[in-house]
Design a protein with these regions (language model features):
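N-terminal leader/targeting and pre-domain segments
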Residues: 1-162
Length: 162
């Protein structure tokens, strides 16, 4: 599907699987406060403007693989009770994952970050995989807690990291 103007899914509650895979959002897209009781698939989405996925609750797996974000994107304050997959994605603007809780494995590997990245005050209960990522701007990841392993193998850091 293509959404040529703003798309507002704020505070939706999906009791079954939610599938937004391969959607193109040309205007601002808002999912703030959404709740997903089953798997949520956003694989392959392209967001050309600002995207807001903040303060969401994912009870099933959350899949954001192979996605492209041209505008700024906000995932802050979200809770992932199962696997969270963000790998193989491209972020051309700032991205905020601050204050997220990951109860299952969190996978961010093989992604490109052109703008600033915030991952402050996150809780990773299980393994977190950031391997082979490229960061071309600042990365702020202070005050985060890792309950499992944190894998940054092969990542490239081009600017200030805290």
């Amino acid at each position: 599907f293509e959404y040529h103007s703003s798309a507002n899914f704020r505070d939706i509650h999906c009791r079954g699987a939610a599938v937004f895979s391969y959607c193109d959002f040309y205007g601002r897209v808002v999912f703030t406060g959404a709740r997903y009781d089953a798997q949520a698939d956003f694989d392959g989405i392209t967001c050309h403007a600002a995207a807001d996925f903040s303060r969401c609750l994912y009870r099933g797996a959350a899949n954001f693989l192979t996605s492209t974000y041209v505008g700024p994107v906000d995932f802050s304050g979200s809770t992932y009770l199962a696997d969270a997959h963000f790998g193989d994605s491209v972020y051309y603007n700032r991205v905020d994952f601050s204050r997220c809780v990951y109860r299952g494995p969190a996978i961010f590997s093989h992604s490109l970050y052109e703008g600033p990245v915030r991952r402050e005050r996150c809780l990773y209960d299980q393994d977190a995989d950031f391997q082979a990522c490229v960061y071309r701007s600042t990365v702020a990841a202070s005050h985060s807690t890792y309950g499992g392993s944190a894998n940054f193998l092969g990542s490239v850091w081009a600017d200030e990291t805290s």
